[in-house]
Amino acid sequence: MSANTENSTIALTADAGSDQNLIVEEFLGHAKADLDPAVIEKVQNGEQVEGVTAYARGNYYKISANPTSPDYIEPFDIHLHFQDGPTVLEGVNGATNEALLKVLIHRTKILDSQFPSEHNKQAIAA
């Protein structure tokens, strides 16, 4: 969890695949007070909890540099906000999986042109 003192709220987050170099968190919502881990688990399970503004699961993420990594150079944050609901009903309100995959494919093609690899070619073809 991380605090936002400006609005006096606490961001509720859960690990979504962190490793030694990167911290990958899913934003679950926010609350005005620190919550017990059992209450956070209820939010993760989709239960409504008084005093918590919950976000739809799988829509909000943050990737940041892990300052404890031996390879750490400088801080950065990447925020990902994915589409919440069908565009015909909700309008375009976030990135789609397809858009993110296009970015990854584009990057892999560039990397493969610089550092040819059979693994890159397999990833591009998949």
Language model regions located:
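Short, compact, well-ordered microdomains
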Residues: 102, 108-126
